[in-house]
């Protein structure tokens, strides 16, 4: 199956928001605890994809539907971020660290810590420690590798990076996306880097930007 980091973020987000909006806690059962442990383990393994058994090869004429290097994916360096095979759009990643999805992971790892601290679920201390460590390492990876510059020399977030110096300037018309970073709770909407990123994405510097008579984006 196509692996996307955000596919594991959403169950954690949904469980957390249900609790916060309604007070409901029945979702935090043994299955939730086990699933959370698996998510933390998988994201940790994929901090260095060389340790992962995941491969994806599809017989297709559409290069976006399969991974290069016999299903292993493109070359990368370890950054602290967690590796992704595919984007929310289901297209494969050009570079293996999808910044919006790593931002989303940072947010939901904070949710995990809050859930297990306040509700004192099974194995809380170990899960909190693992989530805190992973959150810090992914955030450090974002801070060290996720930035690039636009044509004006402004500091912006890249869409994807490989840790080897390559980066893409674009966005995905889904959530998570760079444009949706404040919506997800990753950064403030007035953040200087976010605003520069937003201006860049919503301009011809984004190769997928389109402007017509009545709309642009």
Task: Describe the function of each predicted region.
Residues 49-93:
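Short, flexible helix-coil linker/hinge segments at the edges of structured domains or between repeats
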